[in-house]
Amino acid sequence: MPRIELAPEVFDDFDRFFDHQEKYGIEDTSGRIAEINEAIQVLAHSPLIGRKAKAGKRELVIGKESRGYVALYRYVPDIDAVFVLAIRSQRESGYK
């Protein structure tokens, strides 16, 4: 079973989500982060489940509509590890 590691930038992404949700009065921000973390755990069992992205990376689609996110990650089978590189809202363009 692959180990999952979050890049330091992912925590910046979470901070950005908190700021955005606070700005618009959205409740249950911590619940949304928990949903994202729970979805990422799927990669421990199925690291190739995400759609292919550029440069050997993959994207895991999490949730939908206003609760939709995309996690950019790379699976390295040689060391059996998944590196989550960034997370963005499905409504954002590109990664920060």
Q: Across the structure, where does each feature detected by a protein language model lie?
A:
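Enriched for short, Lys/Arg-rich terminal
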Residues: Q21, K64-K96
